[in-house]
């Protein structure tokens, strides 16, 4: 277990902080500690709910890059819920949900590039506009 903890701290660039109390860490470091706690259990699927909300842009990108590295290097599935689309292009696949008739529905599943083509947009940020103005057009039944 000790080796697993050490490897996890190293993979998340937290080795230098291992003796620091959590309340003294930055927001980005606290998020990485949260990820580390889950990784130590060695799950196949890691669920991250709004893992980047409230972070500065640098820390947000770092969390996204760490998530991608974990998925690829450790052969894990990382499921991340986010409303922030700035670094979403780092994801391998996207699941886009929309609200139609007061119920959440699947609108799209695919790569970021496929998302742009499907919604006929030039930036992922535009997905919200499409779904807010024409939700029924994109709901998959």
Predicted regions and their residues:
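Topological signature of polytopic alpha-helical transporters
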Residues: 3-4, 18, 93, 97-98, ...
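Helical segment within the ABC ATPase nucleotide-binding domain
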Residues: 60-74, 86
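ABC-family nucleotide-binding domains
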Residues: 56
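Catalytic Walker B motif of ABC-type/P-loop ATPase nucleotide-binding domains
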Residues: 46-49
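ABC transporter NBD signature
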Residues: 26
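Conserved ABC nucleotide-binding domain
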Residues: 2, 8-23
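ABC ATPase C-loop
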Residues: 38-39
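Conserved catalytic motifs of ABC-family nucleotide-binding domains
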Residues: 42
């Amino acid at each position: 277990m000790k080796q697993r903890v050490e490897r996890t701290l190293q993979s998340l660039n937290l080795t230098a902080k291992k003796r620091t109390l959590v309340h003294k860490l930055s927001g980005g470091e606290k998020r990485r500690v949260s990820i580390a706690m889950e990784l130590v259990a060695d799950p196949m699927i890691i669920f991250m709910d709004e893992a980047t909300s409230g972070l500065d842009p640098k820390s947000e990108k770092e969390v996204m890059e760490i998530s991608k590295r974990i998925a690829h290097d450790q052969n894990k599935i990382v499921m991340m819920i986010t409303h922030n689309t700035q670094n979403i292009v780092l994801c391998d696949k996207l699941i886009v949900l929309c609200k139609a008739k007061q119920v959440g529905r699947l609108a799209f599943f695919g790569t970021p590039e496929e998302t742009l083509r499907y919604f006929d947009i030039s930036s992922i940020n535009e997905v919200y506009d499409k779904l807010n103005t024409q939700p029924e057009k994109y709901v998959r039944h």
